[in-house]
C-alpha cells in the first residue's frame, strides 16, 4: 500500500478520534458567545481564534468533525446497502431485470449532476441533518449499484458458482453465499471515495444554506459565515476550510491505496 494511503489513514483516524472525543477535546461550548472577543486571532486561549460572535473556532471545528463524519458514515452505509442489493439483483438475474435497472433506473439518476439533484431534493425536503442524509443517499446509491452489477456479472460465470448451480443450490444461496462475498472488494474502495464525496457534499450544501442549519458547527456553514470577513480575519475561514480539505484528501488517499492493494494488476506496477 502506498505511503499516501497510510497518511490518509492517519489523518482520517485523527478526525475520527476528534469526533468521538469532541466533548473532551473542545475547550469551549460551541454555541457560547462572547461579543467582546469577536474575531480574535489564534492565541494560547483560543487556538484557532474566535468568529464573529466570539465563539471558539477550535471547538467548533472539532464538533464539526462529528457532524461531517456522522453524515458521511450514514450516507455511505445506507447507499452501499441499497446499491449493493439493487446492483446484485441486476447483475445476477440479467435479462429484462438488468435492462430495466441498468438501462433505465441507473441512467435516470446519472442523467442529473449529483450536487444539483441534492440541492433540489433538500430544497423540497427542507434543511436538517436527517433530510440532508436522505438527499445524499438518493444520489449516492447508484455508484455502488453499478460497481456491484459489474462484479456480479463477472463472478457469476466462475466455476464454483456454476458448480453450485449444478448441485441445485437456490438463487438466493448462490447470490449471498458464493457471489456477494467474492464481489465486495471494489465496494470497499467505493465506500472510502464515497466518504470523501459525502463530506464534501455536506459542506457544499451547508455553505449554500441547504444543509445543517446554524448554530450547529457544520464546516460548510462556518466557511459561509466567514467568507466575507476573510481579508480581515482569515483564520475564521482557514481552519474549517482546512478541515474539509484534509478530510476529503484523506479518504481519497485511502481509496486510491485500497484500490492498489486489492487489485493485483495495480500492485505489480
Task: Specify the residue positions occupied by each region the protein language model found.
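C-terminal transmembrane helix and the adjacent membrane-cytosol boundary/short C-terminal tail
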Residues: 129, 138-139, 185-195, 234-269
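Generic hydrophobic transmembrane alpha-helix motif, especially the helices
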Residues: 47, 51, 57, 83, ...
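Membrane-embedded alpha-helices of multi-pass transport/permease systems
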Residues: 21, 81-86, 97, 131, ...
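Glycine-rich helix-loop "coupling/hinge" segments at transmembrane-helix boundaries
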Residues: 110, 121-125, 136, 152, ...
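Periplasmic/extracellular loop-to-transmembrane helix junction in inner-membrane transport proteins
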Residues: 1-3, 28-76, 222-241
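Transmembrane-helix boundary motif in ABC transporter permease subunits
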Residues: 22-25, 71-106, 119
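N-terminal signal-anchor/first transmembrane alpha helix
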Residues: 1-28, 105
Amino acid at each position: 500500500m502506498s505511503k499516501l494511503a497510510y497518511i490518509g489513514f492517519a489523518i482520517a483516524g485523527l478526525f475520527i478520534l476528534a469526533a468521538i472525543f469532541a466533548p473532551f477535546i473542545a475547550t469551549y461550548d460551541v454555541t457560547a458567545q462572547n461579543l467582546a472577543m469577536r474575531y480574535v486571532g489564534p492565541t494560547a486561549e483560543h487556538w484557532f481564534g474566535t468568529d464573529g460572535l466570539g465563539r471558539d473556532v477550535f471547538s467548533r471545528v472539532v464538533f464539526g468533525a462529528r457532524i461531517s463524519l456522522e453524515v458521511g458514515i450514514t450516507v455511505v452505509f445506507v447507499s452501499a446497502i441499497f446499491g449493493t442489493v439493487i446492483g446484485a439483483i441486476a447483475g445476477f438475474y440479467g435479462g429484462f431485470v438488468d435492462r430495466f435497472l441498468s438501462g433505465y433506473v441507473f441512467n435516470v439518476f446519472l442523467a442529473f449532476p449529483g450536487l444539483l439533484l441534492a440541492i433540489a431534493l433538500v430544497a423540497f425536503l427542507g434543511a436538517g441533518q436527517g433530510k440532508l442524509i436522505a438527499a445524499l443517499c438518493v444520489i449516492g446509491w447508484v455508484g455502488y449499484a453499478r460497481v456491484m452489477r459489474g462484479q456480479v456479472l463477472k463472478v457469476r460465470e466462475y466455476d464454483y458458482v456454476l458448480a453450485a448451480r449444478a448441485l441445485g443450490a437456490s438463487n438466493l444461496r448462490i447470490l449471498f453465499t458464493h457471489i456477494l462475498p467474492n464481489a465486495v472488494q471494489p465496494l470497499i474502495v467505493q465506500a472510502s471515495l464515497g466518504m470523501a464525496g459525502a463530506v464534501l457534499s455536506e459542506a457544499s450544501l451547508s455553505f449554500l444554506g441547504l444543509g445543517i442549519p446554524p448554530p450547529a458547527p457544520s464546516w460548510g456553514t462556518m466557511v459561509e459565515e466567514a467568507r466575507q470577513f476573510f481579508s480581515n480575519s482569515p483564520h475564521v475561514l482557514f481552519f474549517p476550510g482546512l478541515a474539509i480539505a484534509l478530510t476529503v484528501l484523506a479518504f481519497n488517499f485511502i481509496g486510491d491505496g485500497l484500490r492498489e492493494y486489492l487489485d493485483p494488476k495495480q500492485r505489480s506496477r
